[in-house]
Design a protein with these regions (language model features):
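Carbohydrate-binding surfaces of carbohydrate-active enzymes
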Residues: 1-30, 76, 83-467
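Glycoside hydrolase catalytic-domain groove-lining segments
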Residues: 32-105, 116
């Protein structure tokens, strides 16, 4: 892909085009009215090396369908993984941000356009190109879908303004009211997910590698995206780090979560081992790698952390705290003295915390589907053992993400449910908004400033309404 795009860029430059090369990453799939982004890491693994082309910009192809509780966490994961690979001097960007869709299934609601935009902006996205924004015609039937190219666009074929147009316009006015200080703000994260894009390069396979592809695909969908879902459901904001090419320092990334797979190249294993010994706190989920990507034995990480596998269980039930019937797909049991998350069948425990060098390892040898919301509470409790927790406590479900500038906090509050909510929120143990409730209508989002410096020396302590 990199050689191909580099050649195209050379041809374009020779013809007089002196513009940036935008690399549009695919990966969202049609599942029904709500799409999923489970294969988005495949697109990133294919195209990450294009960032070596001078002037290239990495961008996402974001078609999520209707944004609901079932799929919004996929967007957050896509944001984090994209930002981990893009050039550092570019903004997080979607060059093909869902402003409509090529067919009328699903019929996109204006609330989806609004909530999806707000979610990505909260995640740090400073560049959005709505596609399509204006419908039109493919003359001479040149389009793949014929002449009509309406795309549910905010401005339809005949120039009529759809409700989504006014939604986008209102959001733009909200952003402008916050000023350049908001554009300079960064998303505040609580923890980092470490990942290696090559792990998810699963689009090509032969008979000899089919089992490996199936295994990695399952871990991607259940392990990686399950982790992201449970973090987001608990309002724990995360970013991502490319372990294959970026430095890993406990000072800049004090806490790291990695979803383990059977395969991991030696340099990445060594990087994680050094990280822990130097004082990093590592939560290792699922299993410890034992091979490199070519299937050769590679146990650098397990030896450095003193992790010895004793058994593996499939499809059973476990107990943890007050939960006595937690279904799992896999338990990887490593030798330890005192643990938690106990198998009903063998009484072995899959979770434990140990000190290694100057750092700590939280081993969670657990792989389980996330089909029930109570499992988010379980994961919140498990990772809190490594001091990974949300800064927020709420009395009802709501998505909360902060962007911070030097002086101001910009709080995004999103209600993805179809009911009005009156929320009491605590932030860092103290009542937010001096204890006043935050009211969110059904499927509404708000972008609220805290400690906002206005004109004439006025400081706005907080607001429960948008400026």
């Amino acid at each position: 892909f990199t050689r191909y795009l580099s050649a195209l860029k050379t041809i374009a430059n020779d013809l007089g085009f002196k513009i940036p090369l935008v690399v549009n990453v695919h990966g969202f799939d049609q599942h029904d009215y709500a799409k999923r982004g489970l294969r988005y890491p495949i697109g990133l693994s294919q195209l990450k090396d294009t960032m070596s082309i001078p002037g290239s910009i990495l961008a996402g192809d974001y078609y999520i369908g209707d944004l609901v509780m079932d799929n919004y966490t996929d967007v957050i994961m896509a944001d984090a993984l994209t930002a981990s690979l893009q050039n550092p001097d570019q903004p997080l960007f979607s060059a093909e941000f869902q402003g409509g869709f090529q067919t009328d299934h699903p019929i996109l609601q204006p609330t989806t356009i609004d909530l999806n935009s707000r979610l990505c902006i909260a995640d740090g996205m400073n560049g959005i190109n709505y596609y399509m924004f204006v419908g039109g015609y493919n003359w001479h039937d040149s389009g793949l879908f014929g002449k009509i190219h309406d795309w549910q666009a905010p401005i339809d074929i005949n120039g009529k303004l759809r409700p989504s147009y006014h939604t986008i316009k209102t959001l733009g006015q909200t952003i402008r009211a916050l000023g350049e200080d908001f554009l300079d703000s960064k998303t505040h994260v609580d923890v980092t997910i470490g990942w290696d894009p090559d792990i998810y390069m699963t689009e090509y396979w032969v008979k000899a590698t089919k089992a490996m592809q199936d295994r990695l695909s399952h871990i991607r969908e259940v392990g990686l995206f399950g982790l992201g879902r449970n973090l987001s459901l608990n309002n724990i904001t995360y970013d991502a780090l490319d372990l294959s090419s970026k430095p890993l320092d406990p000072k800049t990334h004090p806490t790291l979560i990695v979803v383990g797979t059977p395969w991991m190249n030696g340099p990445v294993q060594q990087k994680l081992a050094d990280y822990v010994h130097q004082g990093g706190k590592l939560a290792l989920i699922n299993e410890v790698p034992t091979q490199d990507y070519y299937g050769s034995p590679c146990t650098i990480l397990s030896e450095a952390l003193g992790l010895t596998l004793s058994s593996v269980e499939h499809w059973g039930f476990a107990s943890y705290d007050s939960y006595d019937s937690i279904n799992f797909s896999e338990l990887h049991i490593y030798e330890h003295d005192k643990g938690f998350f106990e198998s009903h069948k063998t009484k072995a425990t899959a979770g434990f915390l140990k000190t290694v060098g100057k750092g700590k390892v939280l081993m969670l040898g657990i792989l389980m589907d996330h089909e029930r919301l109570f499992k988010a509470d379980i994961w919140a409790s498990l990772i809190s053992k490594l001091d990974i927790r949300s800064k927020f406590v709420t009395d009802d479900r709501v998505t909360l993400i902060e962007r911070r500038s030097e002086k101001t906090i910009y709080l995004s509050a999103l209600n993805l449910d179809e009911i009005r909510k009156t929320l009491s929120i605590q932030r860092n143990g103290k009542p937010l908004f001096e204890g006043h409730p935050l009211i969110l209508q059904a499927r509404q989002g708000l972008l609220l400033p805290l400690n906002k410096h206005l004109d004439h020396g006025v400081i706005l302590d907080y607001s429960t309404a948008e400026l």
